[in-house]
Amino acid sequence: MGSDDLSAGDKIQKGFQINYMILRDADTGKVIWQENKDFSAPDVEHEARVPVKILDMRAVSREINFSTIEAMENFRLDQKVLFKGRIMEEWFFEMGFVGANTTNTWQSTIEAAPESQMMPAKVLNGNVTIQTSFYDNETLITKSVVRLYYI
């Protein structure tokens, strides 16, 4: 199968990878968690062990460093936070144009749910997954699932 036989999404996915991800306290800039792993791989459930103190923060700054061989007209993410398979929150992020053969860093701020909606870490631990769909416009590039453990 040659590169002409691949769909647009498959072609982008083949040359796309996450190099690292960093979570910071949005108020102080202090690094809470960092992982040098490609969380975009679709055929495996990834795991992330994040400090429990993240649940007490007003907002978290997420930094994703990624590389792509193919250009993307409108790179965007749809994220769903699921508790035992049920959607608790959904977020939409848009980066826009990404050049071919580039490495990029994308920073976004995620605000915490109201305190009245928060659940204790012992209830959340291992029961929360983040499902991320990566798109170029409406073309799905890849979909990944990360299960969260609070340490």
Swiss-Prot record:
Cytoplasm is among the record's keywords: yes
Keywords, sorted A to Z: cGMP, Cytoplasm, Nucleus
Any one GO CC term of the record: nucleus
Record SUPFAM superfamilies: E set domains
Entry annotated with the keyword Chloroplast: no
One record GO biological process: sensory perception of light stimulus
Gene3D superfamilies in alphabetical order: GMP phosphodiesterase, delta subunit (2.70.50.40)
Compartments reported by the entry: Nucleus; Cytoplasm
Alphabetical list of InterPro entries matching this protein: Ig_E-set, PDED_dom, PDED_dom_sf, Rhodop-sen_GMP-Pdiesterase_dsu
PANTHER family: RETINAL ROD RHODOPSIN-SENSITIVE CGMP 3',5'-CYCLIC PHOSPHODIESTERASE DELTA-SUBUNIT, RETINAL ROD RHODOPSIN-SENSITIVE CGMP 3',5'-CYCLIC PHOSPHODIESTERASE SUBUNIT DELTA
Protein family (similarity comment): Belongs to the PDE6D/unc-119 family.
Quaternary state and interactors: Interacts with Pde6.
The name this protein goes by in its record: Probable cGMP 3',5'-cyclic phosphodiesterase subunit delta
